[in-house]
């Protein structure tokens, strides 16, 4: 709207978020400006607070408000099993199954040469340090079952030391799907039915 530049700016910012197209951005903007005006200061404060305090866990790269996230601080995790995921949302999806008791490493993405995302963007140095820990017995690659997710798992498998079991979550997760949208039961079965990566 040419006569409301601040709304145009809001729409443009919302469109930069994944999954929000031009029409959705416009609807959200109208809703906030017309029906939910009292929500806008609260949203602004929540954004500022999150921006100020949320950081990346020093051990696994998950989102946290402390140097270590709750998973890494827990004394009840099996430190011999490391599950590598693409995003904090994927970590949460696996945690919500109640099946996995090991530790995590969050890549914050996947390899995608066409998008200019190479190994350096995936915190490989930090992952390599985790893979070098002496108590590690198994690495589970729980990257999304997409071409990029498969390529990422295959590439990272080459970094795993000899003697450490390498597995991939089972195909109960639909090909082309994303972990954060898979139901708990399917994701739990996929974790239980994981396979060795070289099979």
Swiss-Prot record:
The keyword Zinc-finger applies. It comes from the Bacteria. Keywords: DNA damage, DNA recombination, DNA repair, Metal-binding, Zinc, Zinc-finger. GO terms for biological process: DNA recombination; DNA repair. InterPro entries: DNA_Rcmb_RecR, Rcmb_RecR, Rcmb_RecR_Znf, TOPRIM_dom, TOPRIM_RecR. The keyword Metal-binding applies. A zinc finger (C4-type) spans 57-72. Transmembrane segments: none annotated. One of its GO terms (molecular function) is DNA binding. Residues 80-174 form the Toprim domain. May play a role in DNA repair. It seems to be involved in an RecBC-independent recombinational process of DNA repair. It may act with RecF and RecO. Belongs to the RecR family. This is Recombination protein RecR.
């Amino acid at each position: 709207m040419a006569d409301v530049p601040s709304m145009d700016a809001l729409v443009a910012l919302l469109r930069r978020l994944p999954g929000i197209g031009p029409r959705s951005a416009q609807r959200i903007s109208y809703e906030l400006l017309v029906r939910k005006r009292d929500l806008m200061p609260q949203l602004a404060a929540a954004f500022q607070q999150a921006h100020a305090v949320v950081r990346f866990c020093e051990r696994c790269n998950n989102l946290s408000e402390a140097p270590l996230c709750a998973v890494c601080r827990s004394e009840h995790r099996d430190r011999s099993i490391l599950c590598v995921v693409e995003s904090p949302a994927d970590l949460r999806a696996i945690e919500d199954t109640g099946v996995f008791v090991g530790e995590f490493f969050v890549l914050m993405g996947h390899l995608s040469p066409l998008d200019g995302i190479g190994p350096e963007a995936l915190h490989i140095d930090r992952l390599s340090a985790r893979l070098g820990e002496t108590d590690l017995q198994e690495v589970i690659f729980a990257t999304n079952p997409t071409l990029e997710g498969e390529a990422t798992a295959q590439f990272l498998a080459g970094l795993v030391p000899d003697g450490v079991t390498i597995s991939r979550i089972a195909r109960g997760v639909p090909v082309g799907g994303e972990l954060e949208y898979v139901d708990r039961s399917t994701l739990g079965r996929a974790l239980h039915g994981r396979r060795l990566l070289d099979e």
